[in-house]
Design a protein with these regions (language model features):
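Positively charged N-terminal leader segments that act as targeting/secretion signals
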Residues: 5-17
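Acidic, Ala/Val/Gly-enriched low-complexity intrinsically disordered segments
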Residues: 9-12, 31-33, 38-40
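Aromatic (phenylalanine/tyrosine) cluster motif
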Residues: 17-18, 42
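Tryptophan (W) side chains
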Residues: 20-21, 26
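Extended, small-residue-rich solenoid/repeat segments and analogous flexible loops
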Residues: 41-74, 134
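C-terminal segments of enzyme domains that contribute to small-molecule binding surfaces
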Residues: 44-50, 134-135, 141-170, 203-254
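Flexible, glycine/small-residue-enriched loop-and-beta-strand segment within the central core
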Residues: 65, 75, 82-172
Length: 254
């Protein structure tokens, strides 16, 4: 069916009031202009984004918000981070009740199918002649090595609004900054700076996403920490490809 649109002057406030036909029903919203960026405040049939629901797409179970599904107290995940799967914890490997590390993931991260987070207990002793883990397998006479003899890289920390591509592997102790992008099939063994794209095995820097000034503005603005209502109103800014307009808008709001 071809889309239909009605337009009328807004009775209150500036801009125009639109109604349009979509998926079997009329949708309405007010359009306003701020510093050249169109902002649309949608009336969403009474539904608000809820970080505590498991399935953000009704009737589709292959994409979930991660936070409400977590059982392991050493996995900490922020609001609205999702994975393209029906389960998250199976993607965190070598993570046992006695493990000393944590995995900490921020808000609004996008984790593609097949991504794996490898934790520190995947490591074997490397300062001896053999790396074979005799102490973990029944029948062998070996005590567990001292913690100082085992590689330990610390917690794995993923920032906010990070996109991790399909089948990427994040190794123990890696820290990935806000807004970074991890290319599909990458193996990330080193830290990734905010708003940086890395690809490959081992993952190497492809480029920064933005210039240093815009990165600094985004890190100070921290849109992911704002209320759902405010983030909703910021969507036209967050999805605007005119970076100079975005830059001026952020400066005006800081």
């Amino acid at each position: 069916m071809n889309s239909k649109m009605l337009r009328s002057a807004s009775p209150a406030g500036g801009g125009l009031f639109f109604c349009w036909w979509k998926r079997g029903g009329w949708k309405c919203g007010r359009v306003e202009v701020r510093i050249g960026i169109v902002e649309v405040n949608f009336m969403k049939s009474g539904k608000r984004p809820d970080p505590n629901v498991i399935h953000p797409i009704e009737g589709y179970d292959k994409e979930i918000y991660v936070k409400p599904t977590i059982q392991n107290p050493n996995i900490l995940v922020g609001d609205f981070t999702y994975i393209a799967d029906s389960d998250f914890e199976s993607h965190v490997t070598h993570f046992y009740p006695w493990s000393r590390d944590k995995i900490i993931i921020g808000k609004f991260c996008q984790i593609a199918a097949g991504v794996e987070f490898v934790m520190n207990d995947a490591n074997h002793q490397m300062n001896a002649v053999s790396t074979f883990p005799f102490y973990t397998l029944e029948g062998w006479e070996m005590e567990q090595p001292a913690s100082s003899d085992m590689p330990f890289k610390g917690d794995t920390v993923i920032g906010n609004d990070v996109w991790i591509g399909q089948n990427a592997v994040v190794l123990p102790g890696v820290q990935i900054g806000d807004g970074a992008i991890i290319g599909a099939n990458s193996v990330v063994g080193c830290d990734v700076a905010p708003y940086t794209i890395v690809i490959g095995n081992p993952a190497n820097v492809l480029r920064k996403r933005f210039d240093d000034e815009l990165i600094d503005l985004l890190l100070r603005f921290r849109w992911w920490d704002k209320s759902v209502a405010e983030i909703d109103s910021l969507i036209p800014i967050l999805t605007c490809s005119d970076l100079e307009r975005v830059r001026e808008e952020l400066k005006a709001r800081l």
